[in-house]
């Protein structure tokens, strides 16, 4: 194998076998003979004897250094001051700190300096850089694995011993750890001209990339050949198994790198056209596979890898990238890698690695290089080289293939890929170039793919996608903005001219205004006095109205009580003569007898006589109670009617007992007391009888109590028998009946009822006809059940506009049920065709009746308006009053005026030198008091103003106490209130027109009463609204704003925000003062306890020496990490500004916050505003 040159892979290296098939060329021997002329550097990849001796000699100073133990370090005596300063200066030089940080460490005391020296001496390099470089160059030497020549036998054996048992992957891992953990001088020694470590590492990475690409192409050829064999043999071909496939990419990576080979690409997709099937045969394909497997270059590479115990190419490439990352974390190494074009090309070519983790690492490094000045051009050049080597049709084509057509989803790779594309497109300053790069990715399908994955569940990927879309340039939108800007500038010029004319006119009116102002002040004073008098009168009127309402309620209560007493007196006067003839026995019964007597007194029929033999003519009189039974709980009277009907029409339907006595005439004397109605003894319950019904009724699914469970509860005191006499249940049964088989007659059993029901089901009812749609029919049926009123009553209530008969809820239901024009037309056609209306469904009959009502929509709208008028007035009135009150209080507030005066003073003090003094400011400027920060950025201008007011004007701290109702007014939109009042006015006009259309009669008194009661209220609320508008207008103009486009909610919200911010900043000032006092007290105590604290620190250092060194350097490390904030500003870092650890800070900054341009933030805010406007416009159109 020939020597591996220190150069990148170009398009001439597409076939890697050409470089490896001529190992004995004349140039090779010439380079070996002249190897000593290059100052000890090895450019041809071979080692000389003096190089071997140099490595062994140099390594002695590292291998024989003994590491001091913890005990020996603690027992080491502190040297003299001069020696301590000399050694400490050496430690500072190795740390390579900025001057300010080095000065901070030089101010440490001697004890801390000695601790840092001891900790730094503990960290010593185990091996020199040449130890690792000699091994890498041995792996690169093609003759290290061939020892057939006798004169090189001893020298080559020594090189194999130098490699040892460790693999190349392990050597690279050790090198990466050394580069990352050793001090800076070690890294500088690795990169100096003597060792040339970067060149050796890049040469080895290039060598391993060639081998991996060769393995990937071989795997692609094998896969394509296997598919051809399968297609040729009809799918029965066998598999070809490689002897050493562990280091070959199984993912078919070669297919992605061979876009120029159309035949291989077609075979990778599993398809063959007819021409290829005709020309290719099994006998032609077989030798090609044998040549690929038995090629001399492949055998030499395999033998070289096996003899030198080299690791897998994929592992070596990944660890080599990690080594380059560690080098780039050093400021010298970063600049060397940037200037080493072959290194960047090798990093970019590592994207063909099969591991997604390696791809993500490569993309992160490339993205970080783009953020350094001049790095963007280098990265694009590396991808141009990638395009030539991998034979891409377009740049970034392979990267987009990996991004869009992944075999396994890896979130780190997707985020790194999205981050790289965002930075490589949008980190350039030239806008045209940004648009060009943006379109380059758009042509590869990035925009469509981002639209597909924008709803991904990964928050990190969402953030990167959002950052890219925020940075995107929309050229069409920019053109539109440019045209809008031109027209806006023209409009500004016109407005400026118009403003000049208006200023001239305004100066003329100033004189008139001065004359009218004095008169206005006089009128305002009189109006304020009148307003105070009016307020007092309104308060008195309110008190009198409350007293009047209270008296009316008391009068109604007394009237009701008097009416009740009068009814009781009439009842007693009717029952006294009858009860006197019955003797004292009838008055001796308990509570149930008294209740039954009072209930029977309201009936026109006399009480039933004592029991007598049964008579068939007893249907005209109420049945008598049974004779007094012997058991303690007698049954109830058999003929007792549950409905208590005075006419006794239901008495004949009640079942009579088998031995019912006959009824006497209604003129016989009253019977003796009924035993069944006497109170039951203690511990016993009266047995309730079953209530007969005419129809079958639904069942109430309740949980009933047993008689023994009722004892001691409220149900023991209830008597539902009395309710049966007071309620007419006939209508109840008509409303809730579920059977159609007729009434349940006396003496009929369940079998007969069931038979009648079953017989009725045998006859199929004719299907009803409906002119409504299915959904409309169902909605009408549901609304009709909710309505629960006959159609005649509904129509009568609509004609009379009576909200007592038709509730507001039913009116709203009917507004939804109003027939449409199409439905009215269909019903008219149905009637014209003289079809049977009885065949229509109940819902269609209902809708037919509604369609016949004239102007039903207008009438229902009037009823809805009348029903909601009071609520609307009660809702609008407080809003109007809050605006008026807030405007008046804000204008009359003296404390708020003084606060604004202080703010004006501070503003003029800040701006008078630059902009000149100001005579006033708009209230929107109060929000900017928070944004004006102090020098240390810890406090704002409002903090200082609040502190000044507390110190000089403490009486102004509660200025918000004079601002009444500003919180409520901030939540009220005056435009909406005006619109609501206008809607009330329109509704009132409809009521007036309806009253004028109707003739004088009984149906107009409702409208007249409503107009009489509501017009004054509407006039009052309109007057209050005008007063509120005038007060708000005067308030806005009083504070210097224009009242033309003023928004009440925004205006008062500004005042509320200022008052809240004032309180918050006052609390922060107080808390800051408390903390400063506590800090001062702690500082005073710290001086007294300094000796004790130093002893405790020393004890902790002896116990944990390693942690002690970290604690001493904690301040320096934190300051070094603070430089990452410059990365967050998304400004490109100059190459001379790169510091140690800058690469890690850039990567951490990109993970914490994606790359966004300043113009991208403005565009995203503009898009958000446009989207909000569009959504509001759509909502208004929907409404």
Curated annotation (Swiss-Prot):
Disruption outcome: Lethal; shows planar cell polarity defects with abnormal ommatidial orientation. RNAi-mediated knockdown in the eye results in planar cell polarity defects with ommatidia showing defective rotation.
Keywords, sorted A to Z: Phosphoprotein
Residues recorded with modification Phosphoserine: 225
GO BP terms: axon extension; cell migration; cortical actin cytoskeleton organization; mushroom body development; ommatidial rotation; regulation of cell shape
Biased composition (Polar residues): 63-79, 572-584
GO (cellular component) term, any one: cytosol
Coiled-coil residue windows: none
Domain DAD: 1136-1169
Biased composition annotated in UniProt, kind: Low complexity: 641-654
InterPro entries reported in the protein's UniProt record: ARM-like, ARM-type_fold, DAD_dom, FH2_Formin, FH2_Formin_sf, FH3_dom, FMNL_animal, GBD/FH3_dom
Annotated region described as Disordered, given as residue ranges: 1-44, 63-82, 572-681
GO MF term (any one): small GTPase binding
Feature: compositional bias, Pro residues: 605-614, 622-640
Positions of the FH2 domain: 687-1088
Biased composition (Basic residues): 23-36
Domain GBD/FH3 positions: 76-559
Domains: entry comment: The DAD domain regulates activation via by an autoinhibitory interaction with the GBD/FH3 domain. This autoinhibition is released upon competitive binding of an activated GTPase. The release of DAD allows the FH2 domain to then nucleate and elongate nonbranched actin filaments.
Family the entry assigns: Belongs to the formin homology family.
Job description of the protein: Together with Cdc42, involved in establishment of planar cell polarity in the developing compound eye by contributing to ommatidial rotation. Together with DAAM and Cdc42, has a role in neuronal development of mushroom bodies.
Subunit structure: Self-associates. Interacts (via GBD/FH3 domain) with Cdc42; the interaction is stronger with the GTP bound form of Cdc42.
Protein name: Formin-like protein
Organism expressing this protein natively: Drosophila melanogaster (Fruit fly)
Gene that this polypeptide is encoded by: Frl
């Amino acid at each position: 194998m020939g020597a591996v040159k220190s150069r990148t892979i170009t398009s001439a290296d597409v076939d890697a076998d050409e470089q490896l098939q001529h190992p004995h060329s004349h140039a090779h021997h010439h380079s070996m003979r002249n190897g000593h002329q290059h100052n000890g550097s090895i450019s041809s990849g071979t080692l000389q004897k003096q190089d071997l001796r140099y490595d062994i000699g140099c390594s002695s100073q590292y291998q024989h250094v003994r590491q001091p133990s913890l005990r020996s370090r603690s027992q080491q005596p502190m040297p003299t001051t001069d020696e301590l300063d000399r050694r400490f200066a050496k430690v500072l030089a190795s740390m390579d700190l900025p001057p300010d940080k080095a000065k901070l460490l030089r101010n440490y005391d001697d004890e801390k300096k000695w601790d840092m020296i001891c900790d730094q001496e503990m960290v010593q390099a185990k091996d020199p850089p040449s130890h690792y470089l000699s091994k890498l160059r041995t792996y690169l030497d093609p003759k290290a694995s061939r020892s057939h020549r006798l004169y090189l036998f001893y020298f080559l054996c020594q090189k194999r011993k130098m490699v040892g048992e460790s693999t190349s992957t392990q050597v690279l891992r050790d090198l990466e750890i050394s580069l990352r953990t050793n001090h800076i001088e070690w890294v500088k020694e690795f990169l100096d001209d003597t060792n040339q470590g970067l060149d050796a590492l890049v040469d080895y990475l290039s060598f391993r990339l060639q081998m991996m690409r060769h393995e990937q192409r071989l795997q692609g050829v094998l896969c394509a050949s296997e598919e051809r064999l399968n297609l040729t043999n009809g799918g029965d071909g066998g598999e070809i198994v490689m002897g050493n496939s562990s280091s070959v990419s199984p993912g078919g990576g070669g297919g992605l790198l061979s876009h120029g080979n159309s035949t291989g690409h077609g075979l990778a997709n599993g398809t063959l056209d007819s021409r290829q099937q005709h020309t290719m045969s099994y006998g032609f394909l077989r030798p090609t596979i044998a040549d690929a497997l038995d090629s001399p270059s492949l055998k030499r590479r395999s033998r070289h890898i096996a003899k030198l115990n080299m690791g897998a190419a994929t592992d070596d490439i990944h660890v080599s990238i990690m080594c380059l990352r560690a080098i780039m974390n050093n400021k010298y190494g970063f600049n060397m890698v940037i200037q080493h074009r072959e290194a960047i090309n090798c990093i970019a070519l590592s994207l063909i690695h099969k591991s997604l983790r390696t791809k993500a690492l490569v993309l992160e490094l490339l993205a970080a290089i783009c953020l350094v000045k001049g790095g963007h051009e280098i990265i694009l050049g590396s991808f141009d080289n990638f395009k030539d080597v991998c034979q891409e049709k377009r740049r970034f084509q392979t990267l987009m293939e990996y991004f869009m057509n992944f075999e396994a989803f890896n979130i780190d790779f997707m985020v790194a890929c999205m981050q790289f594309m965002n930075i490589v497109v949008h980190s350039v300053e030239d806008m045209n170039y940004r648009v060009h790069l943006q379109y380059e990715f758009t042509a590869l399908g990035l925009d469509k793919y981002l639209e597909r994955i924008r709803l991904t569940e990964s928050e990190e990927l969402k953030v990167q996608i959002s950052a890219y879309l925020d940075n995107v340039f929309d050229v069409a939108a920019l053109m539109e903005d440019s045209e809008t800007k031109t027209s806006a500038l023209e409009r500004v010029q016109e407005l400026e001219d118009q403003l000049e004319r208006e200023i001239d006119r305004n100066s003329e009116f100033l004189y008139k205004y001065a004359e009218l102002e004095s008169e206005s002040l006089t009128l305002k004073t009189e109006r304020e006095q009148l307003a105070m008098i009016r307020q007092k009168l309104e308060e008195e009127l309110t008190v009198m109205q409350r007293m009047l309402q209270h008296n009316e309620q008391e009068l109604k209560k007394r009237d009701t009580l008097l009416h009740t007493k009068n009814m009781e007196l009439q009842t007693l006067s009717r029952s006294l003569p009858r009860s006197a003839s019955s003797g004292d026995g009838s008055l001796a019964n308990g509570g149930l007898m008294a209740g039954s007597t009072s209930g029977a007194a309201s009936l026109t029929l006399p009480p039933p006589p004592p029991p007598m033999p049964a008579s068939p003519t007893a249907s005209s009189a109420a049945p008598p109670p049974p004779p007094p039974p012997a058991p303690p709980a007698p049954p109830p009277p058999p003929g007792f009617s549950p409905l208590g009907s005075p006419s006794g029409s239901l008495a004949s339907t009640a079942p009579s007992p088998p031995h019912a006595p006959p009824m006497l005439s209604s003129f016989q004397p009253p019977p003796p007391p009924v035993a069944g109605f006497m109170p039951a003894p203690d511990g016993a319950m009266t047995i309730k009888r079953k209530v007969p019904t005419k129809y079958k009724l639904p069942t109430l699914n309740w949980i009933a109590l047993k008689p023994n469970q009722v004892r001691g509860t409220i149900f023991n005191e209830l008597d539902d028998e009395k309710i049966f006499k007071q309620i007419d249940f006939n209508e109840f049964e008509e409303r809730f009946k579920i059977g159609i088989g007729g009434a349940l007659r006396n003496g009929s059993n369940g079998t007969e009822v069931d038979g009648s029901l079953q017989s009725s089901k045998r006859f199929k009812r004719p299907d009803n006809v409906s002119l409504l749609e299915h959904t409309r029919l169902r909605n009408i049926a549901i609304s009709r059940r909710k309505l629960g009123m006959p159609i005649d009553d509904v129509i009568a209530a609509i004609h009379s506009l009576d909200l007592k008969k038709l509730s507001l809820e039913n009116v709203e239901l009917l507004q939804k049920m109003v027939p449409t024009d199409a439905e009215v037309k269909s019903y008219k056609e149905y009637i014209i065709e003289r079809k049977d209306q009885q065949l229509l469904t109940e819902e269609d009959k209902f809708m037919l009746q509604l369609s016949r009502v004239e102007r039903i929509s207008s009438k229902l709208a009037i009823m809805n308006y009348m029903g909601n008028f009071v609520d609307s007035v009660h809702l609008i009135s407080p809003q109007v009053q809050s605006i008026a009150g807030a405007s008046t209080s804000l204008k009359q507030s003296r404390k708020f005026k003084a606060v604004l005066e202080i703010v004006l003073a501070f503003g003029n003090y800040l701006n008078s030198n630059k902009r000149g003094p100001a005579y006033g400011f708009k209230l929107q400027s109060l929000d900017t008091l928070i944004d004006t920060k102090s020098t240390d950025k810890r406090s704002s201008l409002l903090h200082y103003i609040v502190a000044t007011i507390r110190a000089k004007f403490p009486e102004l701290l509660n200025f918000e106490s004079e601002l009444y109702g500003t919180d409520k007014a901030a939540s009220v939109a005056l435009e909406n209130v005006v619109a609501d009042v206008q809607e009330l006015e329109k509704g009132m006009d409809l009521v007036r027109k309806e009253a004028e259309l109707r003739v004088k009669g009984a149906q107009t008194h409702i409208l007249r009463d409503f107009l009489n009661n509501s017009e004054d209220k509407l006039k009052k609320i309109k007057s209050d609204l005008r007063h509120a508008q005038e007060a708000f207008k005067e308030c806005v103009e009083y504070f210097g704003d224009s009242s033309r486009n003023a928004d009440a909610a925004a205006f008062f919200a500004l005042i509320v925000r200022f008052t809240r911010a004032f309180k918050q900043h006052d609390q922060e000032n107080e808390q800051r003062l408390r903390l400063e006092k506590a800090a001062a007290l702690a500082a005073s105590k710290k001086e007294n306890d300094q000796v004790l604290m130093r002893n405790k620190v020393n004890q902790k250092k002896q116990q944990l020496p390693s942690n002690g060194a970290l604690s001493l350097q904690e301040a320096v490390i934190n300051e070094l990490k603070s430089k990452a904030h410059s990365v967050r500003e998304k400004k490109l870092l100059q190459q001379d500004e790169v510091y140690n650890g800058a690469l890690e800070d850039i990567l951490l900054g990109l993970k914490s916050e994606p790359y966004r341009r300043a113009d991208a933030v403005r565009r995203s805010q503009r898009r958000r505003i446009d989207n909000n406007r569009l959504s509001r416009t759509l909502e208004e159109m929907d409404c």
